[in-house]
């Protein structure tokens, strides 16, 4: 994943997105569904109907970037909400991109060295 500047927020756009949409179509969804400026520098993540493809829209200060990832097996974990946005941490975004369930992470207890 590309390093994000400090203070960058990550938003999952709930619901199903038409993955045929490109820069302008996804930016319009950000404006209407989340009421956030897509040129704010925050990261916006969209998932299609099948669940194996996500798109990430990000303004890097010079232009819009659009990243896509398709899982070879399985589906990306997505919230049940039909609309709106859900804030993720950068760590949760990394887990999402790896196909890990970012909602139920468990920290293991450190082992005791005797």
Language model features by range: what are they?
Residues 1-114:
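Polybasic/polar functional segments that serve as interface/processing modules
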